[in-house]
Amino acid sequence: MYKRQALELANHKPEKCIIFQREKDKADLNPKIDITWEDAHKGAKPAECEKMNSNDYAYILYTSGTTGLPKGIVRDIGGHIVALKWTMKNIYNIEPDDVWWSASDIGWIVGHSYIVYAPLFYGCTTVLFEGKPVGTPDAGVFWRIISEHKVKSLFTAPTAIRAIKKEDPNGEFFKKYDLSKFDKLFLAGERADPDTIKWFEKLSNSPVIDHWWQTETSWAITSDCTGIESFPVKYGSAFKPVPGYDLKVLNSEGEEVGAGKMGDIVVKLPLPPGTFPTLWGADKRYKENYMTTYPGYYQTYDAGHIDEDGYVWIMSRTDDIINVAGHRLSTGAIEE
């Protein structure tokens, strides 16, 4: 049903759709455009690798359009490979013989970068999981997969851990499995509340790294670089800027604010390798959306502050800031 509606709304309709059928929940097919995966696979032959230039684009990934219409993020091949391969060791402390699991949808930036490209560029094993943290079949599915596949580190969204915590607050499922190979939990995609981080730390006796990045960047802007030097956790912060990113906090006049002061978080240009060089078919919009408000800086559209120790606190999107009697209050601060 949803596919039909999407195709009806699309300005550029696909000639064919490849459908992977589920035995327990088969989709109704349109014989004019739908092909099953099995039929498409029949007679398929290996294709030779295509030689590409480093500045050619690897893919187009559309954002949700938080700041207007959806934007087609493009990624240059050379910079993408260099950046992602660097992160596997230096941010995540993964070795080529380790097992890595990014529990995300493969169609999102986390899936692109850390289910497919980064681990495979680096040469380690990557886990691709189709399911949910709860209900497929229970709140222990993450721990079962980690145990069975000897996963060293897990990368997921805070919402996933909150869902598990709600279903299994005492960690009874966690206790059923051998998780001796498990080392760290990395969180991103939204702000991780301190209660959730502390709950998992206590349950697992493992570090929890809440780090921050965007579809536009394809890899972390801030993190604890566990393969270089680990810093103490500050609950509610996303650690410190990763090498390659020079972060500032600016007020509405474009002036840098002091430590602990709320403002717009920006990145001083140039951006490091692996970030988006433009928008698909929209070079002008790329500059107007991201590089114009604060000349010389990339506008992240996230608000927060940097404390006296250099830790970055992402509190909300800039359009979620509430002005009360001249005081800028973030949704993150209100939640706490």
Regions found by a protein language model. Give the residues of each.
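Conserved S/T- and glycine-rich ATP-binding loop of Class I adenylate-forming
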Residues: Y57, T63-T66, M88, W100, ...
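Active-site glycine-centered loops adjacent to acidic/histidine catalytic or metal-binding residues
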Residues: D105, G189, W213, F239, ...
